[in-house]
Amino acid sequence: MAKKKAFSPIFHLSFIVFLPWGIYLSFKKCLGSWITNWWNTSESEIFLNIIQEKSILENFIELEEFLFVEEIFKNNSETHPQEFHTGIHKEAIQFIKIQNESYIHMILRLSTNLICVVIISGFYIWRNETLVILNSWSREFLYNLSDTVKVFSILLLTDLCIGFHSPHGWELMIGSIYKDFGFVQNDRIISGLVSTFPVILDTIFKYWIFRYLNRVSPSLVVIYHSMND
């Protein structure tokens, strides 16, 4: 009976970890060909080209300038307009293919992640028993820890999330989320999130210590302040 009781939380925890991964891979494989075919219709091209028009024009102008300079260095003389335009045409086709693949992957990642979030959220709402079992197991596990271990875990977690070196970690994590959802990386937005999100977390954590830990375990608060100082 005890073995079965110990196995149940591990099973549910493994289920929560591997279910999103399995759903993501399955939908990514299934939706790939469908999104590629949808992209090749004129409606999708018009819609996305309007959104990305500025980016495409800037990249194409840079490509044209690069090819012009490269042609000058190759010939060391006056360039031939016909050859130059032919080269631009070939490179432009290659550039459009790369952009096309980039947009397909962007839509695929975004749609797959959104579908996964909806399915997993619905599943956990429907199977509330799984979350109840994990909640009771985690409460029992934390209750059996000593106050010193609890404080050490809190300090380690807070230093990782809102410590001196945490901005670099937040930058990598937010950048990976941007990439995973298929968004174009924006350094200004990422910098703003990195500079504000840890501050918000720090405020929430201090409020939690003040309201919850003082009420539940005053000795834990004393040990926390002693170790933190």
UniProtKB/Swiss-Prot annotation:
Bilayer disposition of the protein: Multi-pass membrane protein
Keyword Nuclease: no
Cellular component, GO annotation: plastid membrane
Superkingdom, taxonomy of origin: Eukaryota
Entry keyword annotation includes Phosphoprotein: no
InterPro entries assigned: CemA (IPR004282)
GO biological process, one term: proton transmembrane transport
Matches recorded under Pfam families: CemA (PF03040)
Reactions this protein catalyses: K(+)(in) + H(+)(out) = K(+)(out) + H(+)(in)
Segments passing through the bilayer: 7-27, 106-126, 189-209
Family: Belongs to the CemA family.
Function: May be involved in proton extrusion.
HAMAP family per record: CemA_PxcA (MF_01308)
Protein name, as recorded: Potassium/proton antiporter CemA
Organism expressing this protein natively: Cuscuta reflexa (Southern Asian dodder)
